[in-house]
Amino acid sequence: MNIAHIGLVGYGEVGKIFSAGLRVQPGVASVAAWDLKLADPAHRAALQKHAGQAGVVAVDAMQALCARCDCIISAVTASNTLAVAQEAAQHIRPGTVFLDLNSASPGTKQQAAALIEARGAHYVEAGVMTSVPPYGIRVPMLLGGAQAAALAAVLTGWGMDAQPVSEQLGVASAIKMCRSIMIKGLEALVIESYTTARHYGVEDHVLPTLAETFPSIDW
């Protein structure tokens, strides 16, 4: 698998981080981006300025992005996952890789894949396993789909942490979803416990008991 021209759908925090990180990788000739805000006069100038300074080509439509790129990366909100796939499917070229980074359900990813693969393109789902900003493009990712292993080989060659887990779509997303339930649940419990302990003035008494029960955690 050869990838020379990369396109980001979504030029928010994740899109900007991936654009900057991928643009300098060996073999990457160009990085472009499309975001709905580029069609909004209130936001267009600022996004175009940022993209220009970052060496990213800001295009004016999904069609233009698909026409120039052999790898499309979807980095939007979970609620827009399917809408992006629907629009991309109207313009994507056969053989293009479509990497879906969004935190959508396995079922949504499968629906998105059906749209993309019906056009002869290759859909690969990614389960992004933690927050992107501390890691940049090296954020741990699990990949799923028929081309997951081939894409992982390219991404790891760029120093990324991409692990293929299954050719079956939905597996990577399910793993990420189940992990998120646990992690976010634990975070919520810790915050609630700390807040309540501080409210009652017993924080200094609660923390030692937690440290005794869970000695490996720095409470």
Where are these regions (language model features)?
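Amphipathic alpha-helical hairpins
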Residues: E13-I17, A64, I72, V97, ...
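Rossmann-fold dinucleotide-binding core
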Residues: A104, K109-K184
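Glycine- and other small-residue-rich loops at beta-strand/loop junctions that grip anionic moieties
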Residues: Y11, S74-T77, L101-N102, P140, ...
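Rossmann-fold NAD(P) dinucleotide-binding segment
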Residues: M62-Y123
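Conserved beta-strand segments of alpha/beta enzyme cores
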Residues: S30, G55-V57, V97, H122, ...
